[in-house]
Amino acid sequence: MTPDATRTDECRATGAASTSATAISDQAGAKASAENFPVALRFLPRRYRGHLAAVYGFARSADDMGDEAAAGERLDLLDELEADLGRLYRMISWADVPDVARGEGSTGGALGSVDGGIPSGGDPGSRNAGGSSGGHPGAVDPGGSPPRLAVVRALAPAVVACAIPAQPFHDLIAANRQDQVVSRYPTYRDLLDYCRLSANPVGRIVLHIFGAATPEREALSDQVCTALQLAEHWQDVAEDLRAGRIYLPLEDMDRFGCTERDLAAPGAAPRVRALIAFEERRARELLDAGAPIVGMLRGAARAAVAGYVGGGRAALAAIAASGHDVLRATPRPGKARVAMELVRAYATGR
């Protein structure tokens, strides 16, 4: 995003924005403790649940700042969240990071490079990038202040123990910034680029938490996460339209002869159903392409990722079962179907 030259650092750090950011941060943290991310993860060992809950709290906070705050405050709040993320990474020293978390002395689950944080020039999707993070846990700023927001402070144990790079968190913030200025996607490629920011970072963070991040696994994870994001978009077409957003690629709407007025109808016309069926099949193919990641993992990591894959398949099955009418009611899978798909993915490794 292009920085707004008229918005100064002083404006971004106003007390009003700070108060709102703190309130949203606290609420997101409470949601992370009370909700399922996803349901299957409640059965994981406590150390993993804590790290995943912290990541979920951060992601929810970014989403809430981008969706639920007053429209005129959203970019300021996201700036503050990113600045606080920068404080977190500046205060962490490599001396705090266990050898195994740095990929040293591990077997079969090395994290690989933890480089990849925001470079000193900033992320193209970022307006201020929260300061230089040094690229990974270990960049030291002895004179820096600690994070102010609860959801950012809660990330510290996971970032240190699992050597999670900064970039995925910055990408999640960039996705929410994009939501403030982009409400339509001309092409499918444009939508995939958005998913690269809004969905794929979560999978990469999860792999780091389980000590399982490798380039091959990250590539497969990206396919799974993009498919999950697409499934959610197709479930929520009506809700997104009420919020002023359409994630269906405009080129696909044109191909099937659909208009925005069609999407505002109480039920889906045949041409809309055909469009959703096309998008559902494409998301399913993407999910199936990434699903072999399950077979590359063991133990808790395998169970967690099987939960994501199974949940995605159940969501897509619900869309199909609705006759691809996502306008009359939001299609949601039942718990039994989710559990069945999880077990199947875990057992087959895909």
Can you annotate each of these PLM segments?
Residues 1-109, 141-229, 234, 238-350:
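Catalytic cores of Mg2+-dependent Asp-rich isoprenoid enzymes
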Residues 20, 105-113, 117-144:
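Small-residue-biased low-complexity repeat regions
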